[in-house]
Amino acid sequence: RKRADVTLAVRRVPLSDATRMGILAIDETGRVTDFTEKPKQPKSDLASMGVYVFSKRALHRWLSESRPDFGGDVIPDMIKGGARVYGYRFEGYWQDVGTIQSYWEANMALLEDRPELDLYDREWLIHTRSEERAPGKIGATAQVHRSLISHGCLVEGMVVNSVLSPGVVVGVGAVVRDSIVMFDSVIRPGAIVDRAILDKEVTVGPGAIVGEGTDLGVPNRLTPSHLNTGITIVGKQAVIPRGVRIGRNVRIDPNVRATDFPSRTVEAGATVLRHEGRGRSRQ
């Protein structure tokens, strides 16, 4: 109806989050009058959701005349150039997961009795790629509390307040608590994963601990602005050796192997790096 060159999906956010988003102002007709990417001092709480609907003609023109970053270049250039840029206020579920903490919180929110995003609403189905796997199995020795267990999982240990993607295995005596574990990761018998995010195909060896200690406030020394709330992250296909103890706010690189660990203890705030030929750790 408004013959927009581009329409942005927008919604209100807490001002405390606005500094890490694209913030905009709109007039009474819904036309966008200002757009600032990650402002230090936000003038508005209206944020872009990162969803843009362009007319084909406008998209071709502005991509050829502007740099390719939509939030940083294309949208601001269109507004300055007089293009018809409008905002659509979205009132449904949406979460920005641009930080490790917000990603973890969005997953933990799914475990609430009445989550804002209802995964079981038949009127709003979630369409996503999903392999055909066997149903999830809860073994005789398992204990599961307030968790999401996907298809293909085998749980023989304890899972508390956690989200398990398809194909995750939790061995006898293992504990997964307050964590997100992605596809086909294996938690061996007796291992503990606490307040952690494990990428795909990670193996945690028998008796190993990922997320040890009560001091959540020691930030990661390489990336203190990103990893500072007690969450430990483990990269894709990393292997945590038997008995290794890993503290809080630790980053384990993808494909790390036993030879990359300088000792059996990785202190809070450290990073374990993987390099071709040999690995090294930055404590």
Question: Predicted regions span which residues?
Answer:
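Conserved core of the sugar-phosphate nucleotidyltransferase
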Residues: 1-56, 65-66
